Amino acid sequence: IDPVVLFKIVFIQALDGLKSMRQTCKKIKVDAEYRWFLGIPFGKDTPHFSTFSKNYERRFKDSDIFEEIFVEIVNQAIKYNLVDGTTFYTDSTHKKANANKNKYDDEIVTSIKERRKWLEEEINEERIKQGRKPFEYKDEIEEKHIKVSKTDKESGYYHRDNKEKGFMYLDHRTVDDKCNIIVDAYITKGNVHDSVPFIDRAEYIKHKFGFDIKKYGVDSGYLTLDIKKYFIENNIFGVFGYRRYGTPESRKEKNKYEYVKELDIYYEKETGEVLEYKGLIDKNGYKKYENTDKTKVVRRHIHEEWNEIFRENRLSKEGKELYQKRKEHVERSFADSKQNHGYRYAMYKGVKKNQHYTWLICAAQNMKNIAIKNDNVGKKPLALSSILYKFIKILKKIINLNRKIYS
């Protein structure tokens, strides 16, 4: 069967938000518009619902055609001037895996804890500067108890406060500020933290599309030292959601003191008592500031100024506007996918299959967005069938470049 027809069927499913390929093929049998689009006249049999899955296993599984389709649609959005390419919003959403949360095996996983070697070097430089012996950092082995699904072993057990627990996949999505075009959607297990793939995916969109990233709006889950360093080094105006550290008592205690950068001291606001840095810094990069009798201690990270920079960003007028738009863009994108494009549940097992399906869903969502935005700005309206027709031309071009899928 012609692969163009197969992908047409998949996009009919994605654009109409149909729950399954079986339901899609049933509608194709009786819908004149679908038959016209597929080039199948009445009286001729339509493809069986299992046709695409069989072709996927034999022809498309190991190809990169799904990503190429997604990238080509983003490039079409850039061509229509619907992508700004400077301001982005990133977040993740969970998709329920096709797995029973009560059927799992408990496993112990060992891994080497990831080290920040750049931070270790800076800490040791500070210790040498103070005439102290540098620390010897070693690899630490971590052991974790995890739940592994008996049904879908590649899914991850997701548990967060005020969220449903169970086996999930995470979609780490990035959208552009101008017209909410999805520029990246990366699938991981449900037990992967939001911040882990962020830097790699930011580099991906930068090099894939040639974007000059100037601003990023993210929630507090991305407030890590590595991401702050990435924003500083790349001159990106980053806005993080507010995050509370420590206990209310400890925060109240530290707020009693004011830091003087020129003298590198803390002083108590009420009494004027001074806390000085005496060259003590721990393995995590926290410097100790003490009074003369060592009864009062305040810790300050070696890169505390980064926290101050991003706090100023968050409280600035520009930062408040940027963070307000975050939920109007990336959260809206997730809601649209789940409500209108059948994205609420993972219909496939395994990270790879879900990634391929996600590329197609996001490509369909972008196609719909392109049609609506072109209509809204007063240009010649692009009907959905017109978008699909243009997509077929793109698809044929991609398939010709990917002859390996025919083997």
Stretches with model-predicted labels:
Residues 17-30, 40-407:
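Anion-binding and metal-coordination hotspots
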Residues 34-38:
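Short amphipathic alpha-helical interface patches used for protein-protein assembly/oligomerization
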Residues 1-11:
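Basic, short loop/linker segments at the boundary and entry of helix-turn-helix/winged-helix-like folds
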